[in-house]
Amino acid sequence: LDIHGPSILLRHQSDWISGWILQNWNYGEEGNNIKLGWDLSSSSWPEKFDSLYWSDSLPQIKRSGDMLGKIDISLARKLNLKEDLSIIAGTTDSNASFIAADIKEKDGLAVLGTTLVLKKRTHKPVQETGITNHRINNHWICGGASNAGCGILSRFFSNLELEELSKQINPKKSTNLKFIPLNSKGERFPINDSHLEPLVEPRPVSDALFLNGLLEGLANIELKGWK
């Protein structure tokens, strides 16, 4: 905003892509705009935003699954797509995985990517530090995202090394290494501590044992998250 001025549009990546397909960048999907300040409970931006000079840069929010419009005709012809193709508001990547897994009432979902994300269906929003709430098809989904995840694995091992070393691990035997496999300083979930330091030392001579310790550390974070 300081560089481009108040005429800039604040859009999440997926909202920008939807806007490009529509050739209309007015809209934003609610889940992707929580970090911008969108309040799911009241379905509104914070009142204080009204007085800010950049409030017009914010998108018009739509729920996941809402119709945004039809594809731009000239773009449809260029891409050889149907000219009446409907464009629907999507959701976040972790919410998409939750939907794809068809999670039931009492089940939860762990998504291990660059970071570790936990999701669970609830009857109402959960107001706790580090917990985010999303709404999908009139259901509430609460979740938390650790700063730890597969990012720490790729920092030390290649994909081929991970495949080979994993075969040497005995999952029934603990390493007792007590690693905290953060990629950098600071954690947000299951504990909120911006000063928490990674702990991945002392590194064992055995690479398989080291990998096992990192995986145990991730499993411990997941366990604390569910608790």
Task: Set out the residue ranges of the language-model regions.
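Active-site core segments that coordinate phosphate-bearing ligands/cofactors
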Residues: 2-13, 18-24, 35-52, 69, ...
